[in-house]
């Protein structure tokens, strides 16, 4: 079975569904409202289809999985209310993806940045292609904003706060082996092994860590009393390099995590914070420079 939408193509092979992103009339895959609307409909359809036992999301373009949100669209939104609505739309779609009862895999070829990585973080597994073009990161801070589709919540959950904050506050972009070393992706494979690896993970239920797991230190770093200590360290580093009056985004991201951690309510606060930052002169200037 193969079904096509405007921006997405679905291909079901037995009990596995391949979802290919190929944004219409665009050389790269970026995310706007129409992409999100289609993706929400697709995910809700998957949730109702009992014949689908695994989902693999990948790109049908050679330029990469997703380069992020459509910055031109964001720059055209004129009010905080409009930006908040767009941000919450993306959060809702990715939350639906994260809540699917089947294993979900992001097969990353080429660029996976910003909103693209946030989509991948909403999946159970991430596989990176062994390719010089494959890059991952959350570079929003370079545009005077911070991640807004769950990145400030899901990344600290996955990596622990120190590693996640370093990536969020610097906008660092990594090749797949560096990402795998951090725990951001589960496996790096050459192209010839990509399909086999994706199918393996899509048929594997996510491992549930026990309370005694050695990896529980990541959860510990997000506890409220630990957040204050970690925030103080990162704030000192920021003050040594960045004036908060001229460049407020990293301070806003750090404050957001310190106050709300990785609790579910942090998603709304993330959206509220981003919508304020996007209206600042710094963000408006950096987005103009981007084009």
Predicted regions and their residues:
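Hydrophobic/aromatic residues within transmembrane alpha-helices
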Residues: 57, 70, 119-120, 179
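Helix-capping/helix-break motifs at membrane-protein junctions
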Residues: 79, 160, 190-191
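Glycine-rich beta-to-alpha active-site loop
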Residues: 91, 96-143, 147
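Conserved CoA-thioester-binding segment of acyl-CoA-metabolizing enzymes
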Residues: 1-58, 95
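Amphipathic alpha-helical segments at domain termini/boundaries
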Residues: 2-22, 121, 168-273, 287-291
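Glycine- (often His-adjacent) and acidic-residue-rich active-site loop
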Residues: 59-93, 112, 142-144
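Hydrophobic, secondary-structure "cap" segments at the distal end of domains
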Residues: 151-162
